[in-house]
Amino acid sequence: MKIIADENMPNAKVLFSHLGDVELVNGRTLTHEQVREADVLLVRSVTKVTKELLEGSSVRFVGSATIGVDHIDLDYLSKANIGFSSAPGCNAEAVADYVFSALSHLYLTKKINWLSKKIGVIGYGNVGKTVYTRFANMGCQVHVYDPIREKEGGSANFVSLDEILSCDVISLHAPLTHTGSYPTKGMIGRKELAKLSAGVTIISAGRGGVIDESALFDRHKQLNGNLHLVLDVWDGEPAINQKLIAIVDIATPHIAGYSKQGREKGTWMVYQALCQYLALDANVISKHDAISAGWLSFVNVSAEEPQEEMLARSMHAIYDVSRDDIRLRFKYRENKEKNVFDWLRKHYVERDEFNTCIIGVSSSDASNLMSAAGFSVDNK
């Protein structure tokens, strides 16, 4: 069996080699000729899996090590009787870590005390729910907008989009959709951005295109720069809006979900799905062996510290988002070509998830807060 896999899928050869011959390829530039004789195609979000790519090939199964599927023509796969699986939720913890690392950065650089602010989350899928739950468990006043999930029921504090736009912190985790009752393409446009007050923080870590970037730039200017922006996703990736880079607080190349464990989980989930599709034993390689432990095992914190200080120090010990911002700005100063975006993703410096680290705390309040933030806790 011939397996074509994106070169940026960690452990792809380790996991899939016992199933067949694995060839690693550049997912962005993948062609029909490369997949023509393949039986299995394993991709990430940079590969558009279409009829044009697959028609006339021998591909019988497509796996995407991602939570989103907007890059997959699901209708064609169904009509062509091609099996498919993605990895929903694989990087939810990683994206939540990104959000809180960014908020910690804003606290340390601008003294934004986000714990006491009104929080709005857009999108209540696997990632949005994880982010929402962390905020809620930390005692924050948190709301969520997702009309589709709201109709399905649930205990989250669902509100209107206008209510979200009145929040102090807005974290976007919606998929990119162009059709249906609630398309998200350009959902946060000029009209919506005009409702934002000065001092609002926007974190965009879902899909590029949900925010109208031109309107965002203009609103930032109208508010005299008093709009705090953290952008991980961009409209037109891998091209990136240079004007926006210049004004945002944090700019990163679609790596919010790029924790070592999150990416490994994505590969692992697709491996499990392929084994099930082939009616093979999926436990030849254990999950324990497939997903790494963290490198930093223990951090001590003092309950005497302000809560935001304690959180920021712990979070940045594991993952400081500003390092990714600095790398992006440096590489774009060197070379403004669009391949910089993919180069940064391919050569990403690995990071661990908060849950791989044990936090040593001396009080029950601090223990509860750090546990709610996603850490493992050791009560001293």
Curated annotation (Swiss-Prot):
GO molecular function: 4-phosphoerythronate dehydrogenase activity; NAD binding; protein dimerization activity
Active site, renumbered: R207, E237, H254 (proton donor)
Catalytic reaction equation(s): 4-phospho-D-erythronate + NAD(+) = (R)-3-hydroxy-2-oxo-4-phosphooxybutanoate + NADH + H(+)
Enzyme Commission designation: 1.1.1.290
Superkingdom as given in the UniProt entry: Bacteria
Annotated CDD domains: ErythrP_dh
Top-level class of the enzyme under EC nomenclature: oxidoreductase
PANTHER family, per database record: FORMATE DEHYDROGENASE 1
HAMAP family from the UniProt entry: PdxB
Known partners and oligomeric status: Homodimer.
Family the UniProt entry places it in: Belongs to the D-isomer specific 2-hydroxyacid dehydrogenase family. PdxB subfamily.
Name of the protein described by the UniProt record: Erythronate-4-phosphate dehydrogenase
Gene that this sequence comes from: pdxB
